[in-house]
A protein has these predicted regions:
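Transmembrane alpha-helical segments of integral membrane proteins
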Residues: 264, 291-307
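Alpha-helical transmembrane segments that form the membrane-embedded catalytic/substrate-binding core
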Residues: 58, 223-224, 243-255, 289-292, ...
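Short helix-coil transition sites and intra-membrane helix breaks within transmembrane domains
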Residues: 215-218, 288-292
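Interfacial loop-to-transmembrane junctions
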Residues: 302-324
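Membrane-embedded alpha-helical bundles of polytopic integral membrane proteins
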Residues: 2-283
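Short, conserved aromatic-histidine micro-motifs
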Residues: 271-276, 315-317, 322, 341
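Juxtamembrane boundary at the C-terminal end of a transmembrane helix
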Residues: 334-341
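Re-entrant/interfacial helical elements at transmembrane boundaries that shape
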Residues: 228-229, 298-304, 326, 330-331
Length: 341
């Protein structure tokens, strides 16, 4: 009887030991899985140059917001686009201020909003758009000049009195601020107005909006992942070291697939009459979108910043997200009219 109790006690000890060993082995396995997962995530972040969990979460929120606006009304989408445009103007205003350059943000914002909504709601869309951009350029020059002239004249007078000589800082400041302000008008309000112009087709406005927004976005996505994992031949290492020829090909492929999917979904069999147009749209979106990213990289390099802003986690600023959309807008607008979509 005593021997049996001892044997039972030994068996219990062995079972406890086995459970302890199994628990340690499972914890070790989980630790290895966690380490492997962390290593894989770090590798993805390193290759893409982004915090991918944040980038994916932000992209999902943006997609839901855009689709929700389109489902409600195209008017709501135009309001959302106008809000993004003002945020992009603010980012440029802040970024240029780091270089000592001043742009008339309030004037630019008001002129841009009036131009966009007047273009969308007016019967003569293109005429109103051209008039609005012309007025914006004129008012921007005046406001940029006035915002610089008064303080610059004061500085000029003080320097002349203290040093006994004139200064060229006044002329240089006036010219550069006016030139930068004009660049901003042509970069954001003009290109955004081209996108609005494509939305005036009331029958296919939603399809146009999806093409104008999602083709450049798909181009960016394809270029990001193709360049990160397949990129070997640098496209322009001095401007953007991560851009590659393989990334450009990936941009075009993703945009082509997106163009066929959107057009087939909205236009049915009609797209078969011009099956080549989605192909051209995808190729154009890939090329122009990549060119837009390179232009934005040049601008950021000159300013001395990595991102235009920090509003969109994982992406940078609003302008970092919409730069390719802005440049693709006029090109896709022309192609939509050529295809009679």
């Amino acid at each position: 009887m005593s021997q049996q109790k001892n044997d039972d006690f030994v068996d219990d000890i062995n079972q406890i030991s086995n459970v302890s060993v199994s628990k340690k082995e499972s914890e070790s396995t989980l630790s290895k899985v966690d380490n492997n997962g962390t290593h894989a995530l770090n590798d993805i972040n390193r290759r893409t140059g982004r915090n991918m969990p944040q980038a994916i979460a932000t992209a999902a929120v943006l997609v839901v917001a855009i689709v929700a606006c389109l489902l409600i009304s195209i008017d709501v989408f135009v309001v959302l686009m106008a809000a993004f445009m003002v945020l992009a103007l603010w980012e440029l205003h802040v970024d240029f201020a780091t270089l000592g350059l001043r742009i008339p943000f309030v004037t630019l914002s008001l002129c841009s909003l009036v131009t966009i909504f007047a273009t969308y709601y007016s019967k003569w869309h293109a005429v109103v758009m051209a008039s609005g951009i012309t007025a914006s350029l004129f008012l921007t020059v005046i406001c940029a000049t006035l915002s610089i002239t008064i303080p610059a004249r004061t500085l000029h007078a003080v320097e002349k009195k203290l040093q006994g000589s004139s200064s060229t800082k006044y002329e240089h400041t006036l010219f550069t601020n006016t030139a930068v302000s004009l660049f901003v008008v042509l970069y954001i309000p003009l290109l955004a107005s081209c996108i609005v112009l494509a939305l005036t087709n009331t029958r296919y406005a939603v399809a146009h909006a999806m093409l104008l927004v999602f083709l450049p976005a798909l181009s960016d996505t394809g270029g990001l992942f193709a360049g990160a994992w397949l990129g070997k031949h640098k496209l322009s290492p001095r401007i953007s070291p991560k851009k590659s020829v393989e990334g450009l090909v990936g941009s075009m492929l993703f945009a082509i697939i997106g163009a066929y999917a959107i057009i087939a979904g909205f236009y049915g069999s009609y797209w078969l009459n011009c099956w080549w147009m989605p192909l051209i749209m995808g190729i154009a979106s890939g090329i122009v979108g990549t060119f837009g990213d390179l232009c934005a990289s040049m601008l950021k390099r000159d300013i001395g910043i990595k991102d235009m802003g920090h509003l969109l986690k994982g992406h940078g600023g609003v302008l970092d997200r919409v730069d390719s959309i802005l440049l693709c807008g006029p090109v896709l607008l022309v192609l939509l009219h050529l295809a009679n979509f």
